[in-house]
Amino acid sequence: MAPRTTDFLVVGGGILGLTLALELKRRHGDCSVTLLEKEPACGLHASGRNSGVLHAGFYYTADTLKARLTREGNRRLAAYCVERGLPLDRCGKLVVARDAADLPGLDELQRRGRATGVPLEMLSADDVRRLEPRARTHERALFSPRTATVQPTEVVASLVADAGAADIAVLTGVAYRGRGRGGVFTSAGTIDAGYLVNAAGLYADRVARDYGFSERYRILPFRGRYLLAEPGAPGVRTHVYPVPALANPFLGVHVTRRLGGDGAVKIGPTAAPALWREQYDGWRNFRLDECLTIAARELGMLWRDDFGFRRLALAELRTHGRRGLVRRAAGLVDGIHPAAFRRWGSTGIRAQLLDVREHRLEMDFRYEGDDRSFHVLNAVSPAFTCAFSLAAYLVQRIGERLHVVAAAS
């Protein structure tokens, strides 16, 4: 049974909800912290289905929270894995140019990395071959030595253990139902919460609207899937990524080194718009109301061609299937053949925030709140990498809101 009262109530048991709960407890040790997770265990959605890539932070312009927080987030999560004895592969990442048209984008990524202090090396084609003989590039490529790989499920499990040790009440199988005068309604009863922190991922906008926030924002879910290499298929020494289209938040189909020590890879992801928020496989978790709302919104985006949505949709149609993914990956790494990629990994869903007034995708982290509640609305990649640094930043923002109330009273 859920406790009837708590000082802080965190909704959502992904990596960000867990790090927020831990940071709240660290800064407000005399306060009680409760975390709600509607699933039977924490991290079963975006966090547990994450690619496991620990990003370095050079994709983002210096004026963004992503740029500000990713380098420190990378350092802290890598240190956490070492401290806890969790798997960590410091394999680095190559960003390769497919042709001459990609070279300006490569230079822009280097400029962004320099502006935020992220270590990067511009390599010649010969240097690339020495680092990863199978990588294909035009003239040069960018190498990120700080990019790494972790095991998301083990990170989440370790954070759950930390929460228990910190006397945080982690209530799994308990769903948020709504806001009421007597407190927060849950599937296990009403909780009188002094302050609500919303880290609900795919449902963050819905929770926020109960408190008068997210008026201009809605979650637009995107499905992502990877193909896994068959046992014995050739591996790679480092991640290999293309130069992305910097105007949208997706990094393109890439070749990712998996944990295990053998260099085994996966290729992907797809980035197809989902028709309901938890459209993982088949019709499981189907919600008619969500399907109708999201389908209508996506048809409108196609009609208006918001943020080049038609081009994104067409590109996704070309790469959505197995052959399309293999073809794209083969442009990055030699020796990628369809016969070696027959198995799909688990589907992940990106809780991408859409500004419905401006008809554009939000590129940076977004949050809103007041003296009663705080809502993390856009916590897409690299939020897993940033979990510790983002949680520290957000709890500071929460403290500012609570301090204003204390000063006024």
Protein language model features and the residues they cover:
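Short beta-strand to alpha-helix junction loop
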Residues: 61-72, 96-105, 142-161, 314-324, ...
